[in-house]
């Protein structure tokens, strides 16, 4: 998913891109934001896209910096949220070493570290780490590898037990194409590789960048977000992303 991919989504983002904020069943992400928020603190939204989290961040913090590497997406956010006077906007590629120096009290990053290239992910994590002051907090939302595998199990299990014909079988909302790098957490969704993370992988990775993980929770979604024709009888646990609250300790 390069910059050109996201630039083209500026006018169709709401209809084509999954809305984490809207689909968070238990509002766990907002709860995590509330835990670290203060009208005396500064916050950044790294990978803000069209700014869906800005109306939540703006009233809770002293100032907000909205950051994205797609200028068209950033412009859409700025146009939509002109009334949020404590929000500024910055066009930065977070997969390149940042020249800018920041010391935020908190950073929110929602499903932005998706690249299948390890080197680019490493730079992104390093940019996060150096932009948060000591004892500041990172709220990170990230795709769960456990959930991706669990969803495939549920699809297979449901189809087997019900002996469905090919036309009746339940299917994923996105085509799983090349999964030859599944052992690395790379899941190809509609031919686009997305990095997914194990819970323990997240804790270890964040630790290597000077963070101490304080909590890891599930951001639960309905089955309809993952399965196109999900039976109403499909039980919990539901598919999820991970949300991590981590403190910068080094």
PLM features: residue spans?
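Conserved class I S-adenosyl-L-methionine
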Residues: 1-37, 40-47, 139-170
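Class I SAM-dependent methyltransferase SAM/SAH-binding core
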Residues: 50-96
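A short acidic, Gly/Pro-enriched loop at the edge of an enzyme's catalytic core
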Residues: 99-107
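A short SAM/SAH-binding and catalytic strip from SAM-dependent methyltransferases
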Residues: 106-120
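Acceptor-substrate binding/catalytic loop of class I
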Residues: 116, 186-201
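A short glycine-rich, Lys/Arg-flanked "PGG" loop and its adjoining helix->strand segment in the class I
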Residues: 122-134
């Amino acid at each position: 998913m390069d910059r050109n991919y996201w630039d083209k989504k500026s006018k169709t983002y709401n209809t084509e891109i999954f809305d984490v904020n809207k689909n968070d069943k238990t509002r766990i992400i907002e709860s995590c934001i509330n835990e670290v928020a203060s009208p005396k603190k500064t916050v950044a939204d790294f990978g803000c896209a069209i700014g869906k989290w800005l109306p939540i961040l703006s009233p809770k913090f002293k100032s907000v910096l909205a950051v994205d590497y797609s200028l068209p997406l950033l412009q859409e956010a700025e146009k939509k949220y002109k009334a949020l006077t404590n929000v500024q906007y910055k066009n930065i590629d977070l997969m390149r070493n940042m020249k800018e120096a920041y010391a935020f009290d908190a950073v929110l990053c929602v499903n932005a570290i998706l690249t299948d290239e390890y080197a680019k992910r490493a730079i992104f994590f390093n940019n996060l780490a150096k932009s948060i002051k000591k004892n500041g907090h990172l709220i990170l939302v990230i795709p769960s590898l456990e959930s991706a595998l669990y969803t495939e199990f549920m699809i297979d299990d449901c189809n087997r037990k019900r002996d469905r014909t090919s036309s009746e079988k339940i299917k994923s909302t996105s085509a799983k194409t090349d999964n030859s790098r599944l052992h690395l957490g790379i899941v190809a969704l509609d031919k686009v590789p997305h990095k997914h993370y194990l819970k323990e992988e997240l804790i270890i990775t964040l630790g290597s960048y000077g963070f101490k993980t304080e909590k890891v929770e599930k951001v639960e979604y309905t089955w309809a977000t993952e399965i196109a024709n999900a039976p109403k009888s499909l039980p919990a646990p539901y598919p999820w992303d991970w949300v991590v609250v981590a403190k910068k300790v080094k």
